[in-house]
Design a protein with these regions (language model features):
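Non-catalytic, solvent-exposed segments at the cell envelope interface
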Residues: 2, 7-9, 13-19, 28-570, ...
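Low-complexity, acidic Ser/Thr/Pro-rich "mucin-like" tracts of secreted and single-pass surface proteins
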Residues: 569-587
Length: 587
């Protein structure tokens, strides 16, 4: 072969090699583009699946079948993203500035999303296996501490997840990242609080500990809860739990008064709450203040001091009964279907033994509440469902807990079971002063309106309509008049109070000069006036106040009433009995 032929062949070979490399590069670009497009498409699918489930930990913990199927779809989409971007052929893409950022983001999101789902799934296995351990007194404390440790571990794992780059992402990846970030934040809160609660409950049950147990009846309302008509104790130690017999709370009235510990409660309600009569407590929706006073009254005549108090009402009992099944009591079978009607009205219709015995009627809830609470610790309960269903009970103020132990009280506050108010609260309470059982027939509707007044203040107007729908023919014990009462039969007499943010000024009630209560109430301010509403009639009470523009959010606090109070915001009615935060700018 001549030198010219050799040179030609070498040139041809070099051209072929170059062309081949260019072809390979083009094919690789097509392949990488396809894999990247597939990954972005899968990310879009994951985003859609995330939208459908909203990564609600509550449904996750409850084991909802449809939710499980949706989560499986999210997991599948995230795994498809990961597989599309894996392998040695995709490695070079990671160094390309913009494209590489998308690849690194999609890979990190798929990996973190799958890990997050795995963490919660693993925890659910532990929770499912915890049921038998919670039934046995000798295993209860250890089981709760194991749950606390597992939730703490899940919290640590979630906190370590890396979602990859945050800036300059494709819209699909940016949206998936936002959703996953929000879900992880919620998960971190859930695991942190869950771990704290499991640990504190374990410590309580390890004991020795003693709490007052109060049974509140929503047929006769106080501020933020029903009136505590019966009381007993929950005594715990070494994992065992004993719920003592409950007696009418008025039997615990004192011969001499106990000082009201909370200064605002004393200043606002000292004229009515005398420190002796249990039925005259509970005038403020700030449960920590009224609870501390109740425990002080209880301990004034007890040899063994209670650390705190737990208050449950028929709605809390209904939730427990859904999980434990019915209980047999001296008044018959009580289950989740009949407990509300029974205690709010049915028990007063002559359905109880001893129809003429008012003491028996008054104490009927006391016969049931200990049985239901005791069964909570012995029945075979789905722990995940318990976690799920107690959420609304807590949010609706149907389960309230206070402890004199400041560390333990801090946990109750974090869980939302403390009944505390904050400086953004709006709470409307209707306190029964009949005394009768007409709250079951009384509706509360509050419309909120906001008008901006310059750059510094907004004027807020609360228009509350109270309607007495008591039917004719109710027993005297329900509609009155009670002996010694000035309230006519079928009429509702009470005090309607409004707790508003502490920063509010110029708080007033239209056409009312002589207020029943006015002034600071913890982080809020309160005003109130008496109302007398005849059967079939309504009363309208209008409150106005100026709110500094620095207050940007309001928390609508539920009252635990039934019928549930209605809030009207922007013409839209909201009636779920749950706490809600609203933006002042949207009112």
């Amino acid at each position: 072969m001549t030198s010219s032929q050799v040179g030609g062949w070498q040139g041809f070979s070099r051209r072929n090699v170059v062309n081949f490399l260019i072809l390979v590069l083009l094919l690789w670009c097509v392949f990488a583009g396809y894999r990247l497009t597939r990954a972005v498409s899968a990310a879009s699918d994951a985003r859609g699946a995330l939208d459908s489930v909203d990564l609600d930990y509550r449904a996750w913990m409850a084991g909802d079948d449809q939710f499980d199927a949706d989560i499986a779809s999210v997991r599948s989409s995230l795994e498809k993203v990961h597989s599309s971007l894996s392998g040695p052929l995709m490695a070079p893409v990671r160094i390309v500035p913009f494209v590489g950022r998308q690849v690194r983001s999609a890979d990190a999101l798929s990996e973190s999303g799958s890990q997050m789902i795995g963490v919660v799934d693993d925890l659910l296995v532990v929770i499912d296996e915890a049921g038998p351990g919670l039934q046995a007194a000798d295993k209860r404390v250890a089981t709760l501490r194991l749950l606390a440790a597992q939730m703490a571990e899940a919290h640590a794992t979630l906190g370590s997840l890396d979602l990859g780059p945050e800036e300059n992402l494709l819209s699909q990846l940016r949206e998936v990242r936002t959703d996953l970030s929000d879900a992880i934040e919620e998960g971190l809160h859930t695991m942190e609080v869950g771990s704290e609660v499991a640990g504190e409950v374990a410590a309580l049950l390890d004991g020795p500990s003693r709490y007052v147990l109060g049974a509140a009846n929503n047929a006769e309302m106080r501020a933020g809860s029903g009136l505590v008509l019966s009381a007993g104790e929950i005594v715990a130690g070494s994992g065992g739990v004993l719920v003592t017999e409950m007696t009418p709370s008025w039997t615990r009235n004192l011969g001499s008064p106990v000082a009201i510990p909370d200064a605002d409660l004393r200043s606002r309600w000292g004229w009515l709450t005398d420190g002796q009569n249990w039925l005259l407590n509970w005038m403020s929706p700030r449960f920590p203040a009224t609870a501390e006073h109740a425990v002080a009254m209880w301990n004034a005549q007890s040899d063994q001091l209670a650390e705190g108090i737990v208050v449950v009402d028929p709605f809390a009992l209904r939730t427990i009964l859904r999980l434990t099944g019915p209980v047999e009591t001296s008044i018959g079978t009580v289950d989740a279907q009949n407990v509300i009607e029974l205690f709010l009205n049915g028990q007063y219709q002559g359905s109880l033994p001893g129809t003429g015995d008012q003491v028996l009627r008054r104490d009927s809830l006391a016969d049931v509440a200990p049985n239901v609470v005791q069964k909570l610790f012995t029945a075979d309960i789905d722990v995940a469902r318990l976690f799920d269903q107690l959420r609304d009970v807590v949010d609706g103020r149907h389960l309230l807990i206070w402890s004199a132990d400041t560390d333990r009280q801090r946990v109750w506050e974090r869980v939302g079971v403390s009944g505390a108010l904050d400086d953004r609260t709006i709470a409307v309470s209707l306190i029964n002063r009949g005394p009768n059982k007409l709250d079951y027939f009384t509706n509360l509707r509050t419309e909120i309106a906001v008008v901006r007044e310059g750059d510094r203040f907004a004027t807020v107007t609360l228009t509350t309509t109270i309607t007495n729908r008591t039917p004719v023919g109710q027993p005297q014990y329900v509609e009155g008049p009670v002996q010694g009462s000035i309230t006519p039969a079928g009429a509702y007499r009470g005090i309607v109070t409004f707790n508003v943010p502490g920063a509010a000024i110029n708080v007033s009630i239209d056409d009312v000069d002589d207020l029943s209560v006015a002034g600071p109430d913890g982080p809020t301010r309160v005003v109130g006036t008496e109302v007398l509403i005849e059967r079939g009639s309504s009363a309208v009470v209008i409150v106005r106040f100026d709110l500094p523009n620095r207050v940007t959010e309001l928390t609508l606090e539920p009252s635990a009433r039934f019928p549930i109070e209605t809030w009207v915001i922007g013409g839209e009615s909201r009636r779920d009995g749950l706490s809600e935060t609203v933006l002042v700018s949207e009112l």
